[in-house]
Amino acid sequence: MKKRVRALGPLVITVSSTVVLCGSTLLAWGEAHDLVTARAERETTDATLLGIYNPGRAGFALRTASVASSFRIQTVSVTPGSSIALRVSNAPSRARFDLIVDAGTLSRPKDRSWTWRAPDKSALYRVWVIRTDVPDTIVVNAFVTVPTDRLDGEYLNGYRIGRYPKPPRPIYRHPEGFIEVTPQNLDVWVSPHFQLRQFVCKQRSGYPKYVVLEPTILNKLEIILERFNAAGYHANSFKVLSGYRTPHYNQAIGNVALSRHVWGAAADIFVDEDGEDYMDDINGDGRRDISDIRVLYDIANELATEADYQVFVGGLGTYGANSRHGPYLHVDVRGRRVRWWR
């Protein structure tokens, strides 16, 4: 028996309990998931692979937790069995929306708002927010995490996490759970221009690995990338030198205990369009050095004065090259403006 019909531009899919009708082709539900997801991903990820920058924004925004974003690919983390609210904003009054979920339970819609209750099993699930009057979609990657209380001392399923320090402020509360990383989900696009693999801690281990990843840092990186391209430069993504760090790894490299990397809210980045694993010469002076990073710094720093950017305010710091790496820019979210140059 039919449950609902969704119009997606040239595609019309009828969702039943087991199959989806797409045109004259009968598809398994999993295959239909891929088609719907591909519509949101194709516009940006294909452009990235072809060397063409596309910001990857929808014509509306979606609020999850404290962040409202119009990027077509978004990521949230949620503990097993808990709920998250989703609300559409910045859309015309005539716009009509619907949601498709591949698991969990969805509340009845109210004023463009829904509540999704996550499944009890830790895994990657997806929520599609679809504008039905015109073809426009946001895909939410919902990672149901492995709860922190599953830690056995410093280890989670054999992967060494370490111990989080006592939180001096609310933003340093211990994570409620960890995203499980496997070879199968490494290449998931967690935003239009960044993949999960870019944020995995560098400590040596087998699989599974675990990460914490804040949606705010993903949005901040996407906004900086968008402004970088708008300023006349070109990059399809940033190379992430360091994303999430476990407390164990962070201590091993001698970093400060309260580094925002440990909460999945920081990234060390540089531009590497030529694939040489080193900062590109973006200012055209014939050298690849800290002056190129300062171009990136200035673009990111200018954003801090904008009202819509305040939820992403945090640290911004430049680092020069050494024997282990080239110059890079540190970006984080911490609720207050901090700047440094090294």
Residue ranges and their predicted role:
Residues 2-15:
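N-terminal Sec-pathway targeting helices
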Residues 12-25:
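Hydrophobic membrane-insertion alpha-helices, especially the h-region
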Residues 118-196:
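Non-catalytic propeptide/linker segments at domain boundaries
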